[in-house]
Structure formats: C-alpha cells, structure tokens
C-alpha cells in the first residue's frame, strides 16, 4: 500500500445525464493500475444517493439503462452523499497515488472531469491536469486502422467498475495491435 507516482488512476462514473448543470453523479468506481496496466487496487464502488426529484428528471435512456442494471435501486437505497463519496475516494487515492501525478484515465473522461469539477472539486484536483483518454485511440483506430477498431469487444454495461475494466482491456488491445512500442 505504498504511494507510487507511476500508478495510474482509472475512473468511471454513471450520471443521470450528460449536463453537469442539471444532472448528477450516481455511481463512482476507481481502479489503480501500474504503468503496464496491471491492476493494483480497486476502490469499493459507491452508489451516490440522489433525491427522487433528480432520478425522476432522467431521460428515458438513463431510466432504462440504470433501471435494468439495478443502479437506480442502489442509488435510492444508498445513504452516501456526494460529499461523503468524495471523501471516501480521496482517502483511497491517498493510499496509492501522490496528488497531481496520475492523469485521469478512462473512456471519454472529459465528461467525468466536468462532473467532478462541479460536484467533487477536491477529488478532481487530486488528478494531474492531463488525461489518458482511451477514446482518443478508439477514434484514431476507427479512422486509420478499422480492423483494429473492430477487434475491441465491449459489452457497454454502463456499470462503473465493469466499464473501467473494459477501458483497461481496450487500451491493452490498442497497445498490442495499434501502437508500435518496439
């Protein structure tokens, strides 16, 4: 359990929508990997309580997706506030990664960063300002090497921890089949 500045922090969140001005965070997961993408630690996944009015305001896609996964029920049952979720995630990160050393890692993580900046600014500030966004490689492979892009098997569960593991696997795929490391 030693801090290592070379560890990578992988983040995924589920939200009630895509607009931080009106939508809220409902689930957070973190995974720490080494620089070779081997899992070092996983934080407990947190369902963040939100009032019924926030859940009712979700569009049909979010209600359907988060309803099927059971997330809406877990959010209703949760007693963890956004502030408490932020404190728990920061406590976890303090064990593994020094502040402002790891980029935020994941898929389309600019979206996650927008929500963190709005609702959990201390948590967002723990990350380096850089991003390691797997979706950049996805977009490049789609255009430059479609056969590599098509080789990615994603389930798209929209469950935070499962999505992180898919993102790590996707980056491994691009590392092995798209990037020339030798």
Curated annotation (Swiss-Prot):
Pfam families attached to this UniProt entry: RNase_T
Statement: the UniProt record of this protein carries the keyword Iron-sulfur: no
GO biological process per UniProt: DNA metabolic process
Enzyme class of the recorded protein, top EC level: hydrolase
UniProt main location, coarse: cytoplasm
GO molecular function: 3'-5'-RNA exonuclease activity; nucleic acid binding
Record-linked CDD domains: Orn
Highest taxon above the source species: Bacteria
Active site: 129
Keyword terms, alphabetized: Cytoplasm, Exonuclease, Hydrolase, Nuclease
GO CC annotation terms, alphabetical: cytoplasm
Location relative to the cell: Cytoplasm
InterPro entries in alphabetical order: Exonuclease_RNaseT/DNA_pol3, Oligoribonuclease, RNaseH-like_sf, RNaseH_sf
Boundaries of every Exonuclease domain copy: 8-171
E.C. designation(s): 3.1.15.-
Ranges in coiled-coil conformation: none
Function comment: 3'-to-5' exoribonuclease specific for small oligoribonucleotides.
Family label: Belongs to the oligoribonuclease family.
Protein name: Oligoribonuclease
């Amino acid at each position: 359990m030693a801090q290592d500045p070379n560890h990578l922090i992988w983040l995924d969140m589920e939200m009630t929508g895509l607009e931080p001005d009106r939508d809220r965070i409902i689930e957070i997961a973190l995974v720490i990997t080494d620089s070779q993408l081997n899992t070092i630690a996983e934080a407990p996944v947190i369902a963040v309580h939100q009032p019924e009015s926030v859940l009712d305001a979700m569009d049909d896609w979010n209600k359907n997706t988060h309803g099927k996964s059971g997330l809406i029920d877990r959010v209703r049952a949760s007693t963890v506030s956004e502030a408490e979720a932020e404190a728990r995630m920061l406590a976890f990160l303090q064990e593994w990664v020094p502040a402002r050393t790891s980029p935020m890692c994941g898929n389309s993580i600019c979206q996650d960063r927008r929500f963190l900046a709005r609702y959990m600014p201390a948590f967002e500030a723990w990350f380096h300002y850089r991003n390691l966004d797997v979706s950049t490689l996805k977009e490049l492979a789609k255009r430059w090497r479609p056969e590599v892009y098509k080789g990615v098997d994603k389930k798209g569960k929209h469950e935070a921890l499962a999505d992180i593991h898919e993102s790590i696997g996707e980056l491994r795929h691009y590392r092995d089949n798209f990037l020339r490391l030798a």
